[in-house]
Amino acid sequence: MTSTTPNSPIANTAAATEDYPLSAVPPQARKSLISLAPILIGFTLYSGTLFAGGLVGPSVQFWPDLMGLILVGNLILGVYAALLGFIAADTGLTTVLMARFSFGNLGSRWVDFILGFTQIGWYAWGSALMAKLLNTLAGVPESWNGILILFFTYACCSTAYFGYKAMDWLSRIAVPAMVILMGWSLLIANNDVGGIAGLQAVELGDPLPYTAAITIIVGTFISGGTQSTNWSRFAPSGKTGFIATLIAFFLGNGFLIFSGAFCAKVYGNPDIVEVMAQQG
């Protein structure tokens, strides 16, 4: 009878195909910083982060208040995620497997449930946003939204089937495209408001305590930061895992918070879909 023990060739091949979900990533499967950083940056380029920035931007002065909040908030988030990335790269284990060392078998199930539950909302938000974009910008009837949401949800989930390799190739396309799109939007917004001087003169919206602003910036992606270890574990060393994760969450997440806050401050609207429609 064919052997399927953990050390057999068949078992090792299956583990490699599934990206080692129940074991540490072996040395030969580790990835470089150049491969890992774009994946983690792509992970942070989440549409909900734009809305988070949109909630903060109109309520505070652009300089130095808003820039300071973005810097501090994303530094907190980045260091938190980077420390987890260091541990993940050092152990090679997934988020849930590492949770067993902290919370035990039963406790780790609760961790898995809580983090998994947040992803339901994450997918729901992203898929609904894509449907709204098509409604607003392409004139697709709202009666199609159910089908559109299902399509985009399964399209996003499909990357999990193909694992790291699919995320690697997708990030090479999606990250530059997202940066170009948001850069273009920021350029239009900057021209519309009359530069930084015009932005400084924009009337402030309802006041928002700095503690609440920091909570929004950090809290919007703290769950994602916790689960980023599922990718940072592929780093060849703890140092590389730390650097790749810090780059992604401090710069990548910070860029989206800044973009959402900037555009919301210019147009007085935190809804990025309506902002894009207004920009044409």
Regions found by a protein language model. Give the residues of each.
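Hydrophobic alpha-helical segments and their helix-loop junctions in multi-pass secondary transporters
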Residues: 176-203, 210-213, 217-221, 260-267
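Hydrophobic transmembrane alpha-helices that form the core helical bundles
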Residues: 108-140, 177
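Hydrophobic, small-residue-rich membrane helices and short re-entrant helix-turn-helix hairpins
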Residues: 25, 29-33, 162-172, 223-255, ...
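Membrane-water interface regions at transmembrane-helix termini and the short interhelical loops
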Residues: 54-59, 85-86, 129-139, 152-174, ...
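Helix-loop junctions at the membrane interface of multi-pass solute transporters
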Residues: 24, 54-57, 98-101, 158, ...
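Extracellular loop-to-transmembrane helix junctions
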Residues: 54-85, 100, 107-109, 249-250
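Membrane-interface "cap" regions at the ends of multi-pass membrane proteins
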Residues: 1-63, 208-214, 233-243
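Membrane-interface loop-to-helix entry segments
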Residues: 131, 147-189, 204, 242-249
